[in-house]
Design a protein with these regions (language model features):
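Proline-centered helix-kink/hinge sites
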Residues: 32, 51, 71, 76, ...
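N-terminal helix-turn-helix DNA-binding module of bacterial transcription factors
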Residues: 1-62
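Alpha-helical recognition/docking segments in bacterial nutrient-uptake
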Residues: 1-6, 61-173, 177
Length: 188
């Protein structure tokens, strides 16, 4: 048997106010009398109430959620990228939904469709090459799209990364300019 989810009406009854007053307090605490707000806050704390963000998401068409697709949980680079993203999103009260597609374009496509179904406010992709269907879904979603890593090729919206070919070219030119024709590494 499923437990009863605590509702705004439950809080209103316990606080001796209307459901609308509780709703107003959750949205904008300063719009409610200080004493009333303190009473509502105390009750919410006592009963461990967690507001349901779904109605606000529907009303405002904003979820405060970003989708992130990474190709591997095994690569430390992506763990560092996720940590960097989280350090910014958490400060701005955004949540992240993370999907791993294991370098498989069809899996990436399914993950993009799934993330878009959560009404995400933006999406971060780890690569530049996607299925035609993925590109169509992303373009029709009209949300910000950021592609990470390699910046070669046509971008969907925004990109953050580097050009591997140009970096290799610059490296070889520098080596030749310095007359350094051999580079070795102590591979551990």
């Amino acid at each position: 048997m499923r437990n009863h989810r605590i509702s705004l009406q439950d809080i209103a009854t316990l606080a001796g106010v209307t459901k609308m007053t509780v709703s107003r307090y959750i949205r904008s605490p300063k719009k409610v009398a200080k004493e009333t707000g303190e009473r509502i806050a105390k009750i919410m704390e006592e009963i461990n109430y967690i507001p349901n963000r779904a109605p606000g998401m529907l009303l405002n068409a904003q979820s405060y959620t970003l989708g992130i697709l990474i190709p591997s949980f095994q690569n430390q680079l992506f763990a560092d990228i996720l940590a960097g993203i989280e350090s910014v999103t958490s400060v701005h009260n955004y949540q992240t939904l993370i999907a791993n597609y294991n370098y498989n374009r069809d899996s990436e496509e399914e993950s993009v469709i799934n993330l878009l179904s959560y009404n995400i406010d933006g999406i971060i992709l780890s690569e530049k090459y996607h299925t035609i269907r993925t590109v169509k879904f992303l373009r029709s979603a009209t949300i910000p799209v950021v592609e990470l890593m390699d910046v070669q090729g046509e971008r969907l919206d925004m990109e953050v990364g580097f050009d591997n070919r140009q970096a290799a070219f610059d490296m070889v030119c520098t080596m030749l300019d310095k007359r350094c024709l051999l580079y070795t590494s102590d591979a551990a």
